[in-house]
Regions:
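Extreme N-terminal starter segment of soluble prokaryotic enzymes
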Residues: 1-5
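Glycine-rich, highly charged phosphate/nucleotide-binding loops
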Residues: 46-65
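N-terminal glycine-rich phosphate/adenylate-binding segment common to multiple enzyme folds
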Residues: 61-80
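Conserved N-terminal Rossmann-fold NAD(P)-binding element of oxidoreductases
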Residues: 7-9
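A short, Lys/Arg-enriched amphipathic alpha-helix followed by its capping loop at the start of a domain
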Residues: 17-28
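Short glycine/serine/threonine-rich phosphate/pyrophosphate-binding segments
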Residues: 12-17, 80
């Protein structure tokens, strides 16, 4: 599937970003990437697709190749 936005999530701010995106365009196709199942649980209410798992450089490349997106928003922890 082609997504409008990939949100690299991991902070409270990532939830705020997703909320704003959906408020602006409820039909926005969003994929969120989180490191843990807990992160996934925190985003389930938004009805978006969620990738779970820690990603290194190659993991991100694979994610991008398998899930094309028009925009990427990095809302991960600033020290991660």
């Amino acid at each position: 599937m082609k997504y409008d936005v990939l949100v690299i999530a991991g902070t409270t701010e990532s939830r705020q970003v997703i909320e704003k995106l959906l408020r602006a365009n409820p039909k926005e196709r969003i994929l969120a990437s989180v490191a843990t199942e807990l992160g996934k649980e925190m985003l389930l209410e938004y009805g978006i697709d969620i990738h779970v798992g820690r990603l290194d450089y190659d993991g991100f490349l694979t994610l991008f190749e398998e899930n094309p997106c028009r925009k990427i928003i990095d809302a991960s922890h600033p020290f991660a």
